[in-house]
């Protein structure tokens, strides 16, 4: 995700979608439309993205491993197809999403992120894990998360955050957010709110009020 402005953008030639579409065309000789389970944002690294597409010809229907190998050979080194299988012709990845999970990695010591800097946020301030856990608990559930988006959507901003898990191992902290779906920028803003609670070492229900979150 480091080199790309997201999965799908207006500048299609630089997006992950464009690279994958081009690889499919080069390998199969067919142009196709991609449907992604989640349209990731700039700098987001997707480890389990699901993409569906249709091919008219069945030249690879009996050998998906060969198609996967050829696609990976045609793709940039920082994009990879990890699994490929034939789905029901009615399956559309963008319509089949039940939930998605984002993970925010935080290092409290720059040395702890030496080999994972592109995927890790370095925060040198002292963080109070208990305050972060309390903020996470308040943000879990069904709320109007309008304040946690770029404000450009005309659709409902009510979302259900199913779980927020915070784990710490030495100088590394992971915030794992799972929701039925996320608004644009919502994962980053949720993680930022939890981080703020950890820095200030205090949190109560004003966390929701200050963030503009309303129970739905």
Per-range role (PLM):
Residues 1-216:
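Structured-RNA-binding interfaces characteristic of tRNA pseudouridine synthases
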């Amino acid at each position: 995700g480091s080199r790309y402005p997201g999965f799908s953008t207006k500048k299609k030639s630089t997006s992950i979608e464009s690279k994958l579409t081009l690889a499919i065309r080069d390998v199969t000789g067919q142009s196709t439309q991609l449907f992604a389970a989640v349209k990731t944002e700039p700098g987001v690294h997707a480890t389990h993205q699901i993409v569906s597409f249709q091919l008219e010809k069945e030249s690879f229907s009996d050998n998906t491993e060969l198609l996967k190998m050829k696609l990976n050979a045609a793709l940039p080194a920082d994009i990879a197809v990890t699994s490929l299988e034939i789905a029901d012709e009615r399956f559309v990845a963008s319509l089949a999403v039940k939930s998605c999970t984002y993970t925010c990695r935080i290092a409290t010591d720059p040395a702890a992120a030496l080999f994972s800097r592109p995927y890790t946020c370095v925060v040198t301030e002292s963080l109070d894990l208990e305050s972060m856990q309390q903020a996470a608990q308040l943000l879990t559930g069904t709320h109007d998360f309008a304040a946690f988006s770029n404000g450009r959507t005309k659709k409902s901003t009510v979302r259900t955050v199913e779980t927020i898990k915070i784990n710490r191992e030495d100088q590394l902290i992971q915030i794992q957010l799972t929701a039925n779906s996320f608004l644009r920028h919502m994962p980053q803003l949720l993680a930022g709110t939890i981080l703020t609670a950890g820095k200030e070492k205090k949190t109560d229900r004003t966390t929701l009020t200050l963030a503009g979150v309303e129970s739905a």
